[in-house]
C-alpha cells in the first residue's frame, strides 16, 4: 500500500518538475528572412469535405523533433494551430486536438474539420517543440468548411 501511495505521489511530482524544466529551455535563433506559410489552403478559401493543408517554409530547413547536434542549426518542424490563439513565445508548444505536431518532419496533412469557419496558423518549433527566437509564425488564416 505504501509503495502504491509513493508512486501516486512521485509520478505527479516528476511530471510537474519535467514541465517546469521544459519551460526553461533555451530558444534557438532563426534567420531574419525565414518565413513559414500556407501553400494550401488559401486565406478565405471555402472547402468541401476534408482539407488538404500544405506547409511552406523558406530560409530554414525541416528536421524531425528531438534531432540536435551538428548540421541541425536553422532547422525545426511544423506545428499547426487549429481554432487556437497564437502561442506563448517562451513555452513548449502544446499538443492536443487544437495544436497538431508534425515531429517526423511532415510538410502536409489532411484535416477532417466540422462544417463552419475555422482558423489555421503554422508555428515552426525547434527540436524541443519551442518556438524560435523570434518566433516563426505564419499569418493566421480563416477557411470555411461546407
PLM regions and their residue ranges:
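Short acidic/polar inter-strand loop motif in beta-rich domains
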Residues: 87-90, 125-133
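A glycine-anchored, Pro-Gly-centered beta-turn/N-cap motif
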Residues: 49, 76, 114-116
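Short, well-structured beta-strand segments within conserved domains
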Residues: 51-55, 107-109, 116-124
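Short amphipathic, basic-aromatic surface patches that mediate peripheral association
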Residues: 56-71
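Short coil-to-beta strand junction motifs in C2/discoidin
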Residues: 67-78, 137
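Bacterial N-terminal signal peptides
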Residues: 9-16
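Internal, hydrophobic beta-strand segments that form the core of beta-sheet-rich folds
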Residues: 114-128, 137-140
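Short, compositionally biased P/S/T/A/G/V-rich stretches that sit at domain boundaries
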Residues: 24-48
Amino acid at each position: 500500500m505504501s509503495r502504491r501511495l509513493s508512486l501516486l505521489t512521485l509520478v505527479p511530482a516528476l511530471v510537474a518538475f519535467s514541465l517546469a524544466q521544459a519551460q526553461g529551455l533555451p530558444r534557438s535563433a532563426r534567420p531574419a528572412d525565414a518565413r513559414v506559410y500556407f501553400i494550401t489552403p488559401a486565406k478565405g478559401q471555402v472547402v468541401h469535405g476534408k482539407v488538404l493543408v500544405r506547409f511552406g517554409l523558406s530560409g530554414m530547413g525541416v528536421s524531425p523533433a528531438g534531432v540536435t547536434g551538428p548540421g541541425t542549426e536553422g532547422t525545426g518542424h511544423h506545428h499547426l494551430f487549429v481554432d487556437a490563439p497564437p502561442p506563448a513565445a517562451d513555452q513548449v508548444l502544446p499538443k492536443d486536438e487544437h495544436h497538431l505536431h508534425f515531429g517526423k518532419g511532415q510538410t502536409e496533412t489532411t484535416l477532417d474539420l466540422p462544417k463552419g469557419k475555422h482558423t489555421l496558423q503554422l508555428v515552426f518549433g525547434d527540436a524541443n517543440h519551442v518556438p524560435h527566437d523570434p518566433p516563426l509564425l505564419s499569418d493566421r488564416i480563416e477557411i470555411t468548411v461546407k
